[in-house]
């Protein structure tokens, strides 16, 4: 299975899991396409809370890099949409989510997450609870 196919499979799996948790979600893959604008791989919304997820997968290894141009593009998308940007990182069988501001910026302007930072990220259920904790509850919702 090619890396592109593995990435697409992972993105579809995430979309399905988010949908099962009540999110409105779309997959917007752009890698390998001729798109000039950069968009995150997954856009998910729940009760007005928007999360944007750039997915990266590694069989093993200790770092995940995002090139400067791609990072700046998806950060701009996040700013325009009002969404919160995350890196979804799958290393071996673990799937973790990091807020994009947790990534370190290199001297060349690229972004990197080392293995320790990735391991400290949220798992899927923690990500869902994080989003649900941001949903505003009004008095009407309790009646």
Swiss-Prot record:
This entry's Enzyme Commission designation comes to 3.1.21.10
Which pairs of positions does the record mark as disulfide bonds? none
State any single GO MF term.
DNA binding
Residues where Mg(2+) binds = 11, 41, 54
Instruction: Look at the named UniProt entry and state the broad enzyme category this protein falls under.
Output: hydrolase
> What is the documented disruption phenotype for this protein?
Not essential, it can be disrupted. No change in sensitivity to mitomycin C. Double hjc-hje mutants cannot be made, double hjc-pina mutants grow more slowly at 55 degrees Celsius (versus 65 or 75 degrees) and do not grow to the same cell density as wild-type.
Q: Which InterPro entries match?
A: Hjc, Hjc_arc, Restrct_endonuc-II-like, tRNA_endonuc-like_dom_sf
Write down the required cofactor(s).
Mg(2+)
Q: Which UniProt keywords apply?
A: DNA damage, DNA recombination, DNA repair, DNA-binding, Endonuclease, Hydrolase, Magnesium, Metal-binding, Nuclease
- The active site is formed by 31
Site label Transition state stabilizer, positions:
56
Q: How is the cofactor bound?
A: Binds 1 Mg(2+) ion per subunit.
Task: Report the catalytic activity.
Answer: Endonucleolytic cleavage at a junction such as a reciprocal single-stranded crossover between two homologous DNA duplexes (Holliday junction)
- What processes does the entry annotate via GO biological process terms? DNA recombination; DNA repair
Q: What else is known?
A: A second Holliday junction resolving enzyme, Hje, probably with different substrate specificity, exists in this organism.
| Protein family per UniProt | Belongs to the Holliday junction resolvase Hjc family.
- What is the stated purpose of this protein? A structure-specific endonuclease that resolves Holliday junction (HJ) intermediates during genetic recombination. Cleaves 4-way DNA junctions introducing paired nicks in opposing strands, leaving a 5'-terminal phosphate and a 3'-terminal hydroxyl group that are ligated to produce recombinant products.
Question: Subunit info?
Answer: Homodimer.
> What's the protein called, per UniProt?
Crossover junction endodeoxyribonuclease Hjc
The record lists the lineage as: Archaea, Thermoproteota, Thermoprotei, Sulfolobales, Sulfolobaceae
This protein's encoding gene: hjc
